[in-house]
């Protein structure tokens, strides 16, 4: 099937993917008086006396906003708010289908960090949570951190943390299959945007010690003078041999071809076709290849297997081991809303990844991660998101 043509046809047929549906009957004067005037005044009075009652009397308890400025949409880049709206609608459909959560797509016609933060703070009283989506790095880091500290509802940038959680879950099962230990494996992360940074931080929290990051210029290391503040921070936690001795052979300076040699795991959140078969052959025995660029991965699975890969995962649904955020974000917000979690912590993210990995009872190279359609996946992630 030509999914591009079919998608365009269906989007036009249905005028998008969402509609508003009433939960209550409105068939007569009594209904009108109960659900609108004069009856609606009573829940208003109760909420005015105690704002926490808004969770009892309105949609807030099970409703989130999916918010984007359209600057980092899929593999399309900065296409603007209107062009990003179909993705935000789709995200809302997934929240409803997999977690039963009401979600509203909101696209903002500004790239200004202060304006985005102020706008979200102004509309936050309607929502029980905020899912940030497709906002480019490095602005996305400040926006998320500021909102987390200034709002009293959970805020998550899914491109960062959803990707990181599903990636870690795949690695946990991959290590079981290859009989390698997290303390010993050497990882390369190709791509230093929102996803790459969050993946790296979560892997380090999990206990992985040796990570090298590569951007379009080359490896991240202290000797580079072109690094933004986020990449500067990464020089303290990745490619750490460079901190001890920049002239050491363990300090990797160069491009992807140099950085991938002798690595156990390649994680790509970068660009199509950048990983060659020769690069895969230069890795350690039984390497794992997580080629997550969409829609075309860093290397096609067939080529990776031919070059000796033991496990291959991509972001695509037409290959095994699809590392898709839909395995994570419905459960994260279901748990957060149900358990009244204000802040989604690192410990919760680690637990969510472990739960997702353990959901696959007997992982094999062709199945290191479950399908989002398997019953129980959402609840296994949601159970990790609780206070205490």
Residue ranges and their predicted role:
Residues 1-155, 388:
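N-terminal ligand-binding/catalytic initiation module
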Residues 12, 55-60, 96-97, 122-124, ...:
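Solvent-exposed alpha-helices and their adjacent loops that cap or buttress functional pockets
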Residues 74, 81-99, 157, 161, ...:
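Glycine-rich phosphate/diphosphate-binding loop of Rossmann-like nucleotide-binding domains
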Residues 105, 131-134, 155-158, 189, ...:
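General beta-strand structural signal in soluble alpha/beta enzymes
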Residues 133, 181-185, 213, 362-369:
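Flexible, glycine/charged-enriched surface loops at secondary-structure junctions
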Residues 158, 291-388:
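Adenosine-phosphate binding glycine-rich loop
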Residues 232-311, 316-318:
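Rossmann-like adenosine-cofactor binding region
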